[in-house]
From Swiss-Prot:
Protein role: Involved in mRNA degradation. Catalyzes the phosphorolysis of single-stranded polyribonucleotides processively in the 3'- to 5'-direction.
Cofactor field: Mg(2+)
InterPro entries: ExoRNase_PH_dom1 (IPR001247), ExoRNase_PH_dom2 (IPR015847), ExoRNase_PH_dom2_sf (IPR036345), KH_dom (IPR004087), KH_dom_type_1 (IPR004088), KH_dom_type_1_sf (IPR036612), NA-bd_OB-fold (IPR012340), PNPase (IPR012162)
Binding site for Mg(2+): D493, D499
Lineage: Bacteria, Pseudomonadati, Pseudomonadota, Betaproteobacteria, Burkholderiales
Major localisation: cytoplasm
Biological source species: Burkholderia mallei (strain ATCC 23344)
Protein name, UniProt field: Polyribonucleotide nucleotidyltransferase
């Protein structure tokens, strides 16, 4: 009898074969599933606490996606030779998995749940994020935890005007779209994408195509659960205290209505805090008078939050003004200023209502590119975008330091939005870093980073293909009534049913991110939302073009200049020198940065044009070939009885024989030459061994012949 109750499900999915299995590995976890897609193998595990911690008032879900270097047949770098802190890719993939799973846990479920996905084997052509998402969904489904899944996921590419399901990495490179969609049988829950200025209907078509194709994976998970699933947890939400609900509503509703008439964010937050405190104090006072135990503040806070949501959503669906007084389609006032910082290469201050981004662009050389040691192989990133949001941006105190998951995710979204409109490395050889410092935040700060990033790049002189703008949208749905909100505030983000961010140019979408919290949002609703987002994006693009018509034609005086020369690849070692000695001396003495590619292209960069010219001259001398008939200004290195060794170019010497110094017979070479003396010589012969024969006498004879030639009439 086997020790394991191993259940396996296999299915064909597009061009790929998928295998799901449970029951053999990690049996003490609440749920564990191995997913194998064409040799990319992940182990997804789920553990759920049997009870919530006392006083818990939120759902503590953590998702950790971990790539093991052995999966690609590698040993980790570093002193300890083991995996360390999560890479940016691991953080982004953890967020990608978290986003569609979180909305499917029932309201009031506060037990701690941890999802851990290990990448065990990697086929470089099959990205591990889709297997990881399917594995996490399947592990939750077999665990018996209260989870309204399963979730399916698919990657969609757009090649030759056709959608491609779960493309290989080679297909992604040729695609104008890289889109990941996740959802249940009935609804899309999450979209993450990067595109090359595609129209809205193509983007929506990709979402619908991906949702249709993921049903195959969802069906397989259902089959796995039927055969290998654990019993469902007997969990029931805590019964609602209707009397407490009614009393909180009676005490707080008028004050909350008044608070949401305040247009200024900080003043409104102050008023809301007062309402929360006053309501809790009143309830405690009543409990003392009645001799009962007062409701805990977390429960009261949740009731007040639900009441806030009901007020704001009701006002919007009834056609009343939004929190800040706008209608559903209006973008907040925009202010733009470029060239804000005097010594940076490019900068822009982009303000939209109470959201503000100070964005700075810096130009560097090839040596400044980010080297990424990914499982599928090492590669370089010439464009980096980093997003920072310090606590003062929302008027709060908090930790300042390394970027949090949210900051990494927002930075990647803004990068995706801009990358399609950057010039190629051949057109613009610089590496580029953009940093977005969020100085004020009230919703849509990642999209402010897109707008500010585009403007800062143009200010730096980067020849962008087009202006790029981004806008954050919201959606509220109640029954058959819905409202799409343009340029949402932070409060509208928290209280809505869907938030999605669209970035692009006048010609199409470059990035789309959707997070949907409820079932029932149809293709038609998404169509309306995308059309309204385009309207908002075009408005912002108009403001940006009014402020900055195009990229600066001149780089900042503080940005490095670059020149490129081509050398014989066989001469690269001469330029580098033993242990890098030659190139190190070159860079230090000329104040330049020098990059040499394997094909012999040498890039010299510096803010000092004289230093660049000197470095160029020296490299040309090092790599030059000695040619017969050419005249060189050489230096006498050594005197011999039969002649002198003369240095012509760095590392290249020749013999000036005693008979080739002057026309008369030379008895003592010291009468004519000294070590260190500059001497003009002509190359008269080279042989297959690289030996060079020189003559000074030949130049004397040529000069005499020219002197004897009568001038032409």
């Amino acid at each position: 009898m086997s020790l394991f109750n191993k259940i396996v499900k296999e299915f064909q999915w597009g061009q790929q074969k998928v295998r799901l299995e449970t029951g053999e590995i990690a049996r003490q976890a609440s749920g564990a599933v191995i997913v194998d897609i064409e040799d990319t193998v992940v182990l997804a595990t789920v553990v759920g606490a049997k009870s919530a911690k006392p006083g818990q008032d939120f759902f503590p879900l953590t998702v950790d996606y971990i790539e093991k270097t052995y999966s690609a047949g590698k040993i980790p770098g570093g002193f300890f030779r083991r995996e360390g802190r999560p890479s940016e890719h691991e953080t982004l993939t953890s967020r990608l998995i978290d986003r569609p799973l979180r909305p499917l846990f029932p309201e009031g479920f506060y037990n701690e749940v941890q999802v851990v996905i290990h990448v065990l084997s990697v086929n470089p052509e099959i990205p591990a994020d889709i297997p990881a998402l399917i594995g996490a969904s399947a592990a939750l489904a077999v665990s018996g935890l209260p989870f309204n899944g399963p979730v399916g996921a698919a990657r969609v590419a757009y090649v030759n005007n056709e959608y491609v399901l779960n493309p290989t990495r080679e297909q992604i490179k040729a695609s104008r779209l890289d889109l990941v969609v996740a959802g249940t049988e009935r609804a899309v829950l999450m979209v993450e994408s990067e595109a090359d200025q595609l129209p809205e209907d193509v983007m929506l078509g990709a979402v619908v195509f991906g949702h249709e194709q993921m049903q195959t994976a969802i069906d397989a998970i259902h089959e796995l659960v039927r055969e290998g699933g654990k019993p469902e947890w007997d969990w029931q939400p805590a019964p609602k205290d209707e009397a407490l609900n009614a009393r909180v509503t009676e005490l707080a509703q008028p004050e909350l209505l008044a608070a949401y008439q305040i247009r200024d964010k900080q003043a409104r937050l102050t008023k809301l805090k007062e309402v929360y405190a006053a309501t809790s104090a009143k309830l405690e006072e009543e409990a003392v008078a009645a001799g009962t135990v007062a409701a805990d503040k977390a429960t009261v806070g949740n009731i007040l939050f639900d009441l806030e949501a009901k007020i704001v959503r009701g006002q919007i669906l009834n056609g009343e003004p939004r929190i800040d007084g706008r209608d559903t389609r209006t973008v907040r006032p925009i202010e733009i200023r470029t060239g804000v910082l005097p010594r940076t290469h490019g900068s822009a201050l982009f303000t939209r209502g109470e959201t503000q981004a100070l964005v700075v662009a810096t130009l560097g050389t090839k040596g400044d590119e980010q080297i990424i040691d990914a499982l599928e192989g090492e590669y370089r990133e010439r464009f980096m975008l980093h997003y920072n949001m310090p606590p003062f941006a929302t008027g709060e105190t908090g930790r300042v330091g390394s970027p949090k998951r949210r900051e990494i995710g927002h930075g990647r979204l803004a990068k995706r939005a801009l990358v399609a409109c950057l010039p190629s490395a051949d057109e613009f050889g610089y590496s580029i870093r953009v940093v977005s410092e969020i100085t004020e935040s009230n919703g849509s700060s990642s999209m402010a980073s897109v707008c500010g990033g585009c403007l800062a790049l143009m200010d730096a002189g980067v020849p962008m293909k087009a202006h790029v703008a981004g806008i954050a949208m919201g959606l509220i749905l109640e029954g058959n009534k819905f409202a799409v909100l343009t340029d949402i505030l932070g409060d509208e983000d928290h209280l809505g049913d869907m938030d999605f961010k669209v970035a692009g140019t006048a010609d199409g979408v470059t990035a789309l991110q959707m997070d949907i919290k409820i079932q029932g949002i149809t293709k038609e609703i998404m169509q309306v939302a995308l059309a309204q987002a385009k309207e908002g994006r075009m408005h912002i693009l108009g403001k940006m073009k009014d402020a900055v018509a195009g990229a600066n034609t001149q780089l900042s005086e503080f940005a490095p200049r670059m020149i490129t020369i081509k050398i014989n690849p066989e001469k690269i070692r001469d330029v580098i020198g033993k242990g890098g000695s030659v190139i190190r001396a070159l860079t230090e003495e000329t104040g330049t940065t020098i990059d040499i590619s394997d094909d012999g292209v040498v890039t010299i960069a510096s803010t000092n044009s004289e230093g660049m010219a000197e470095a160029k001259k020296r490299i040309e001398n090092i790599t030059a070939e000695i040619e017969v008939g050419h005249v060189y200004e050489g230096t006498v290195l050594k005197l011999l009885d039969f002649g002198a060794i003369v240095n012509l170019l760095p590392g290249k010497d020749g013999l000036l024989h005693i008979s080739e110094i002057v026309n008369e017979r030379v008895k003592d070479i010291n009468d004519y030459l000294k070590e260190g003396q500059q001497v003009k010589v002509k190359v008269i012969q080279t042989d297959e061994k690289g030996r060079v024969r020189l003559s000074a006498k030949a130049l004397l004879n040529e000069a005499a012949a020219q002197a004897d030639t009568p001038p032409q009439q």
